Amino acid sequence: VDDDGSLRDLKERVSTYPAATRRRILIESPELLETFLSQMTMAYQRGDYEMVAHRRASIQATYFNMLFALNHRYHPGEKRLLEHTSRLEALPRDFTRRWRELQLASVDAPEITTRTAGLVDELLALVSTRWKTRFSPSRVDEHCEGRPQADTPSES
């Protein structure tokens, strides 16, 4: 029973993904991903595998926030993320397999930073293409060299 129309009003408010939220996530997240990836790389180089695991988790949280925002979808929470991404239109190539491999990789695996960087690069390329955001080269480190950072976005 929705006598006062409050349920109807709530459904209308959440029926479309807020453009301002999407814009904020897509503007701020690339820099966060760059920072976390740089920290992950430095932690790996010094053998701090606990920090590598922490940065991988930070990258995952930011990455999925960005992926759902790009697709105009509310983030479903931490459970069954890959199941939820299967319904998204804009995804990096072979995303599910590659993400699973990354998550199952040991934190001391030599390829962990390059696999992570590859997925981040492809997500940022999708943002650039789908959101028509201009990017400029990053100045983070050699693992992130030439990688995009948000410059001046335009909504699409």
What are these model-derived regions, one by one?
Residues V1-G47, E145-S156:
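Conserved NTP/Mg2+-binding pocket subregion across the NTase superfamily
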Residues I25-S29, R55-R56, I112-L119:
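Amphipathic alpha-helix face/heptad-repeat signature
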Residues S38, M42-Q45, F64-H75, K79, ...:
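Charged/polar positions within long, soluble alpha-helices
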Residues R55-T62, E83-H84:
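Small-residue-rich helix-loop
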Residues H72-R100:
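Short, charged amphipathic alpha-helical segments flanked by flexible coils
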